[in-house]
Amino acid sequence: MAFTNFYSAGIHTNHGMTATLYSFPALMFRNLMKGTVTPHRKGLPTVLKQLGYDNMFFMTHEAQYDNMKAFFLTNGYKEIFSQESYPKDSVVNSFGVSDHFEFDFALQQLNTKAKKHQPFMATILTISNHPPYVVPEWFKARTKDPETQIVEYADWAIGDFLRKARKQPWYKNTIFVI
């Protein structure tokens, strides 16, 4: 199934995450992942956790950015993988690792998790479309425009991940939401 017309859930990444995972609309000038005390939200991760799913969240950057680590651990995720989880030499800019590195890392974790025969949910947050753009030198983009190049790269990286995932035994029982 593919949707060709859709709207962004907000301007900032935190809006998209809370909208997609917890069904909260974007509230301008408000980050629903932050608070004096880490807020509890009911959504897909918490419901799946109650049903016995082992939930993982992958991000390219530092775990504390936007209070993501505390928020996601409080709200249904068991494991958080972030810049602190990756080798230091894999970091390419202030937002952490490249998309293809994160997808390959996530694939290894998903394969390990699948061997335990426990259902799981994995959320993979990529950040390559945030400046400063870093397109790997080996990637051959069809354009010279940096913003178009990074979109080409991001598209290639997710396609590469899906091609590799398709070869895994857990693929046939997996739903991908992009």
Regions found by a protein language model. Name each.
Residues 1-178:
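Solvent-exposed soluble domains appended to multi-pass membrane proteins
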